[in-house]
Structure formats: structure tokens, C-alpha cells
Amino acid sequence: MDYFTLFGLPARYQLDTQALSLRFQDLQRQYHPDKFASGSQAEQLAAVQQSATINQAWQTLRHPLMRAEYLLSLHGFDLACEQHTVRDTAFLMEQLELREELDEIEQAKDEARLESFIKRVKKMFDTRHQLMVEQLDNETWDAAADTVRKLRFLDKLRSSAEQLEEKLLDF
């Protein structure tokens, strides 16, 4: 059973996150291992396994990129295990330049420049994210997979920039 079905939700990217949260709580109550403490060993094991599956499904569906990757996996694009990478050389060059810029910001300990950098990367991420949403809605799986690969780069870059921000603020 796929994670969307487990939560009683349609298999699409845009979800009702409140319904997702409520269903998670219901499933957790229903399959919590403590409810099966007096059951047989097989029942206890099944409850632990079901609870782990529910938790994994929850983590996957509530995180936007993970949800997109999972949805793509249901359509034959297993991005988590694939060896493919972004083939867009202009995008890759831009990523290298952004990484170099982040390194320069770190060396200079320039908080104002870092703040501007983070805003720019967030805007780039948001623009690509909106494109991905449209591609998933239109079921253009190849294009959506390519966009998700690019979003991974931007997500890692954003995370690195935010870690640097914390480091500079603690300094």
C-alpha cells in the first residue's frame, strides 16, 4: 500500500496538510505498539512494523521535496536510488558560482551579504518549486523529476547558507 492510500489521501503533490496531520494522529493511536503489549509476539511485531511504516509515511508526505520524490517513485522515477544527475550545464555552472560566492561570504564573514544571498537562493528555490508543482499537476513526470533534482541542489545550498548564518550569529 502506498503512503497516500495509507493516509486516505489522493496521490498528488498538493495535499491538505491538516488532513494529513489528523490522519497521522488517528493512525498512531490505532497502531501504537503499547496497544498491543498484551497481544501475541506476532501481533506486537506487526504493530511495531505498522507504526514504523506510518512514521515513515508521515515524514515523507509532510516534507515537500520528499513528497515530490515519493510521488515520482510511484510513476517509475526512483530519485533516491538513481545515478542520474542534473545534465543542465548552465544550471550546474550557476550552482558552482553560488557555492563560490557562499565561500567568499564565509571568508569575509559578511552577514549583510549572506542575508541577501539567502533571499536570492530562496527566491530561486520558490520559482523552481512552483514549476515543479505545475509539472506534477500536469503529470509531466520527466520534467518534474529534472526539476526535483535541481531543487535538491538549491535545498542543500539554502541549508548551507542557513548553517553559515547560524555560525556567524554565534561568532
UniProtKB/Swiss-Prot annotation:
Keywords from the UniProt entry: Chaperone
GO biological process, alphabetically ordered: [2Fe-2S] cluster assembly; protein complex oligomerization; protein folding
Pfam families (UniProt xref): HSCB_C (PF07743)
Domain J, first and last residues per copy: 2-74
GO molecular function, one term: protein-folding chaperone binding
Gene Ontology cellular component terms for the protein in this record: iron-sulfur cluster transfer complex
Family: Belongs to the HscB family.
Stored NCBIfam families: hscB, PRK05014.1
Subunit structure: Interacts with HscA and stimulates its ATPase activity. Interacts with IscU.
Protein function: Co-chaperone involved in the maturation of iron-sulfur cluster-containing proteins. Seems to help targeting proteins to be folded toward HscA.
Protein name: Co-chaperone protein HscB
Organism the protein comes from: Escherichia coli (strain SMS-3-5 / SECEC)
Phylogenetic placement of the source organism: Bacteria, Pseudomonadati, Pseudomonadota, Gammaproteobacteria, Enterobacterales
